[in-house]
């Protein structure tokens, strides 16, 4: 995953394929049966321009092709460009994600089941920042999916 994001030649197709593989593992389980949208953790436009792709969005696309669940990239937006989290300490991660995201048109997620998707969960601070913005939406159920987790 790290090489796909930060290597000399970042490669979006790796994340798409990993998303398909992950979805194929869960296709017979019922965990995605009532999901309305797969929502990738968004990148700031500057980081998106630098990398050329959003790895979480590529994972979502792969999952969507297998599970037939739409990908929503319009409602959850990153409004601040924070430093890379991968090598930060826990408290710094929590501080880095404050007011990092906004929900546009939250009423459209009312009574929906949303699954947030990212490549790796380390401290959970990014996912928690997104969920904090989503919890006021009436009837919105939130799930979380990541390809992996990092630990020390």
Model-derived regions, located:
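Basic, glycine-rich
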Residues: 120
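Generic enzyme active-site microenvironment
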Residues: 40, 116-117
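Structural alpha-beta junctions
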Residues: 68-69, 140
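PRPP-dependent phosphoribosyltransferase catalytic core
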Residues: 115, 125-152
């Amino acid at each position: 995953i790290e090489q796909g994001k930060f290597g000399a030649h970042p490669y979006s197709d790796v994340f798409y394929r990993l998303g398909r593989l992950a979805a194929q593992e869960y296709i017979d389980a019922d965990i995605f049966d009532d999901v309305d949208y797969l929502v990738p953790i968004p990148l700031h436009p500057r980081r998106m321009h630098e990398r050329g792709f959003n790895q979480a969005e590529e994972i979502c696309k792969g999952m969507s092709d297998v599970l037939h669940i739409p990908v929503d990239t319009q409602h959850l937006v990153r409004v601040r460009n924070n430093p890379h989290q991968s090598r930060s300490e826990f408290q710094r991660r929590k501080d880095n994600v404050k007011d990092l995201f906004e929900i546009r048109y939250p009423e459209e997620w009312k009574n929906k089941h949303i699954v947030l998707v990212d490549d790796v969960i380390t401290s959970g601070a990014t996912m928690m920042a997104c969920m904090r913005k989503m919890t006021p939406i009436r009837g919105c159920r939130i799930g979380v999916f990541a390809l992996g987790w990092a630990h020390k």
